[in-house]
Amino acid sequence: MKVYISADMEGVTGVTNWEEVDHNKSAYSQFQKQMSLEVAAACEGAIAAGAKEVLVKDAHYSGRNILPLYLPRRTKLIRSWSGHPYSMVQELNSRFDALMMIGYHSRAGSGGNPLAHTMSSAKIERITLNE
């Protein structure tokens, strides 16, 4: 089994303020570690469920938030941005058996998450699931 994990930061446990996800602010390092631990737990769960390959995309801001030292050895981490049209799920394709989204937030205006926002449509016009 091959698993793709895309990780954002605004939905990580305990995040309630933009300063907690801004690498220039003092609270950031605490939530950077929390994000890394949550992604590591997802990787370990995927491996325990039979994944032979786990690919992680750091999909928050600069793409350089996840601390690799927390990830299982067989995990491949994509850092930074390549300009790929799939953006937060770059390199996702039909060879993957599962997609996990860790630390994601709700859409703008939906409530329930103080950092809810929506992806820009500057590069993506439409995303369709289960069509």
Indicate residue ranges for each PLM-predicted region.
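Short coil/turn connectors at secondary-structure junctions
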Residues: M1-K2, A49-K52, R73, S94-A98
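N-terminal glycine-rich anion-binding loops that anchor highly charged ligand groups
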Residues: V3-E20, F31, M35, A49
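Alpha/propeptide regions of enzymes that mature by internal proteolysis
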Residues: S26, Q30-K57
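Glycine-rich loop at the start of a catalytic domain that most often binds anionic cofactors/ligands
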Residues: Y61, N65-R74
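A glycine-rich helix N-cap at a beta->alpha junction
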Residues: R73-L92
